[in-house]
């Protein structure tokens, strides 16, 4: 599958696409406050591109548990200047991480080429129109609850079939709204209304989502379920601590093995190194003496 864009093509199936996360927020769980000013944000984006990022995913509102709602106007103030400047200097596609149609529309005008909607086209009725009218690829994520209102004790009768059914409904809605089927990417939403055991099961059964015949994005980077699984201490349990990096890399390699096409990460260089090592092992051949 190929998604054509003004700045080139994203081709799925041959290589894993690495999306580097750029949060221009004061309160994101990992990098909140690091990239609040334009120069810091641009410098971080440049570092990720230098490290090999294929996409820069820019977000202006934290969606971690208990995060605060941000108005569309405030969100635009955070992301639009970064998108405008970054799009002038790089051929790398820019993704806008938002569930607000107004923000997405302005971001596309500023140079963004992909919409990453964590609400799965549920939070804003206008989002599908924006994607359709601009012929913009869109990432539809599964979420149980609302971006700022996850259930504290989520329950699934049959986890994977329920998520697949969700995607079937949202894909049908997207296509009926004018979004081209080949402009849709799915994301099972690790950590969004899921317990640690749900996240682990999704990774183990990620291949099951291939029945939808769409590219799959996975984001596990430094999420709290890693700390819970690894039983990290309070100090180690901080997402800014490197203690979550090892667990992150393992989950990402499992995702790649199980069929992920895109991985959304904070640590671009380390992720690419891990994928390269996995690929080397997978393709290794040793000639035996005869």
Question: What is each stretch, according to the model?
Answer:
Residues 1-25, 172-179, 284-287:
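N-terminal amphipathic alpha-helix/helix-capping segment at the start of soluble metabolic enzymes
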Residues 3, 53-55, 170:
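Active-site loop-to-helix "anion-binding N-cap" substructures in soluble metabolic enzymes
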Residues 5-6, 30-39, 43-44, 63-85, ...:
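Active-site-adjacent loop and "lid" segments of alpha/beta metabolic enzymes
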Residues 22, 52, 115:
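Conserved hydrophobic/aromatic pocket- or pore-lining residues that grip, position, or stack substrates
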Residues 27, 189-191:
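Short strand-loop junctions, especially beta-strand C-caps/beta-turns
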Residues 43-59, 258:
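Catalytic domains of carbohydrate-active enzymes, especially glycoside hydrolases
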């Amino acid at each position: 599958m190929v998604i054509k864009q003004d700045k080139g093509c994203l081709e799925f199936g041959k290589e894993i696409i690495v999306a580097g996360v750029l949060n221009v927020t004061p309160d994101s769980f990992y990098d909140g406050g690091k990239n609040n000013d334009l120069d810091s944000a641009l410098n971080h984006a440049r570092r990720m591109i230098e490290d090999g990022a294929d996409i820069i995913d820019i977000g202006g509102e934290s969606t971690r548990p208990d995060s605060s709602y941000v108005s569309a106007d405030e969100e635009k103030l955070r992301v639009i200047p970064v998108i405008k400047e970054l799009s002038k200097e790089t051929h790398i596609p820019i993704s806008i991480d938002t569930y607000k149609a107004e923000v997405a529309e302005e971001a596309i005008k500023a140079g963004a080429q992909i919409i990453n909607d964590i609400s799965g086209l549920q939070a804003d009725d206008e989002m599908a129109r924006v994607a359709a009218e601009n012929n913009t690829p869109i990432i539809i994520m599964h979420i149980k609850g609302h971006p700022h209102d996850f259930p504290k004790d989520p329950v699934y009768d049959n986890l994977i079939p329920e998520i697949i059914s969700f995607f079937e409904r949202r894909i049908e809605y997207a296509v009926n709204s004018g979004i081209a089927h080949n402009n849709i990417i799915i994301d099972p939403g690790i950590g969004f209304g899921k317990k640690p055991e749900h996240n682990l099961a999704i990774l183990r059964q990620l291949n099951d989502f291939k029945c939808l015949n769409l590219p799959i994005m996975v984001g596990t980077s430094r999420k709290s379920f890693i700390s819970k699984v690894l039983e990290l201490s309070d100090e180690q349990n901080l997402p800014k601590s490197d203690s979550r990096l090892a667990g992150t890399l393992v989950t990402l390699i499992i995702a790649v093995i199980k069929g992920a096409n895109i991985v959304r990460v904070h640590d671009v260089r380390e992720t690419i190194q891990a994928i390269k090592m996995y690929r080397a092992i997978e393709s290794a051949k040793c000639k035996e003496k005869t």
